[in-house]
Amino acid sequence: MTPADLAELLKATAAAVLAERGLDASALPQMVTVERPRIPEHGDYASNLAMQLAKKVGTNPRELAGWLAEALTKVDGIASAEVAGPGFINMRLETAAQAKVVTSVIDAGHSYGHSLLLAGRKVNLEFVSANPTGPIHIGGTRWAAVGDALGRLLTTQGADVVREYYFNDHGAQIDRFANSLIAAAKGEPTPQDGYAGSYITNIAEQVLQKAPDALSLPDAELRETFRAIGVDLMFDHIKQSLHEFGTDFDVYTHEDSMHTGGRVENAIARLRETGNIYEKDGATWLRTSAFGDDKDRVVIKSDGKPAYIAGDLAYYLDKRQRGFDLCIYMLGADHHGYIARLKAAAAAFGDDPATVEVLIGQMVNLVRDGQPVRMSKRAGTVLTLDDLVEAIGVDAARYSLIRSSVDTAIDIDLALWSSASNENPVYYVQYAHARLSALARNAAELALIPDTNHLELLNHDKEGTLLRTLGEFPRVLETAASLREPHRVCRYLEDLAGDYHRFYDSCRVLPQGDEQPTDLHTARLALCQATRQVIANGLAIIGVTAPERM
């Protein structure tokens, strides 16, 4: 029995108790929850439902809790139910009922934990979206890991997710990039406002391989040649780095396309129809202050050129016209001002501001031997995705970036994350999976098969803890998806791995020597099979491998 199953059972029991006593059963909340008590001796699960309901139905919380506890003790699968404190209900499950989660996991396999929580939602998830002027820096790498994990997580809950990369190939930074390439190709110093690093020299050489006569072209053609070929080469490198990191995108949208084909003009025309566009001082303004922004925004400048927000408006409208009802933007720490701006833009189009969600990621610092690592050997300036992967590998890089809330700055200790020790969180979790895989191989050599027919024998306290943690997985995924917090999956996996290691140290799974196999052995094998499955499912969500051997 999972916590969700118990919550539904508690709700049904409460409805029957209220109806029996002539009280208003409609006062029941739509969703009833149960929690694991902080002190295990208090029971397997606890609920404050009586305290939530008492005032609404005109009774005392402890009295209502007593009625519910009495009714629960008559329900199959409930071993005991007791009232505690001001009206808590502490519940213990019968072993057989608690152990049913093993069967649920084995039957569901890779889909255990999935739900239809977000069924019908069409989600556009835009992340990374780095300028094609250099390799992915370490901050963008965090979004590459977290964004991909969030996409996988939302998919498990029934959402139709499209991962999108907004390709910033419009604006002055692309001109500076082209000028930097030209300078490198000519053997000249990097322009004062240009880009430096060995990657610039490498790309300049590749441009000349593709266009050997480029340096003899007139200035305008020269810049356009280095701009077009250089951007394509840089973006190919970015996509390859992301692919090797385990992050791929469904759609790549060019910012330049927002400024061609009339998309910006179309967006402004739509906004004029809503009355939210006006002219002042020779410029065109969007009335975003009416929708929560701190000031109105210039859309078309007085010189007739579009402001940066013009592309954002066209891009948002493009997403909505493609049918997305939720647009999630994952932006860097310097983009806090975009939250109100993008929500106001949605409202100006007549949409619910909740159509837009903006996640802001904080800084990432790399540490080696207690000292910050600041310089990239490849880029010559900032640290990159490739630097991190070279230092600790893809799995550790992804896990280290995902396991903390995105609104928290993180320090990645390169020595810790590359170590084969229990202090390394990804090693700790992966080792649990490898240990379980080895156990399955050893069982197969003994011709032992996991058996779910005697799960009532799993009555050791370490078995009970492991069973309860397995049952938490669906709710962890629902909560993580609802809050857009994939780090919760990492923390859950660490808890599960710890519970498994403690179980393994206390409960012998396989017979030893001449010992004959028993029903307890095969029941424990089933518990191990379920644990292995849940660890694999969780690692798949965060895009980390589940090794069979370590």
UniProtKB/Swiss-Prot annotation:
Keywords of this entry: Aminoacyl-tRNA synthetase, ATP-binding, Cytoplasm, Ligase, Nucleotide-binding, Protein biosynthesis
One Gene Ontology cellular component annotation held by this UniProt entry: cytosol
Subunit-level organization: Monomer.
Source organism per UniProt: Mycobacterium tuberculosis (strain ATCC 25618 / H37Rv)
GO molecular function: arginine-tRNA ligase activity; ATP binding
Catalytic activity as recorded in UniProt: tRNA(Arg) + L-arginine + ATP = L-arginyl-tRNA(Arg) + AMP + diphosphate
Main location: cytoplasm
PANTHER family, per the entry: ARGININE--TRNA LIGASE, CYTOPLASMIC, ARGINYL-TRNA SYNTHETASE
Family: Belongs to the class-I aminoacyl-tRNA synthetase family.
Chain's gene name: argS
GO biological process, alphabetically ordered: arginyl-tRNA aminoacylation
Location(s), subcellular: Cytoplasm
Lineage: Bacteria, Bacillati, Actinomycetota, Actinomycetes, Mycobacteriales
UniProt-listed PROSITE patterns: AA_TRNA_LIGASE_I
Gene3D superfamilies (UniProt xref): Arginyl tRNA synthetase N-terminal domain, HUPs, Isoleucyl-tRNA Synthetase, Domain 1
Alphabetized CDD domains for the sequence: Anticodon_Ia_Arg (cd07956), ArgRS_core (cd00671)
Motif 'HIGH' region per record, residues: 130-140
Pfam families from the UniProt entry: Arg_tRNA_synt_N, DALR_1, tRNA-synt_1d
Protein name in UniProt: Arginine--tRNA ligase
EC id: 6.1.1.19
Class of enzymatic activity (EC top level): ligase
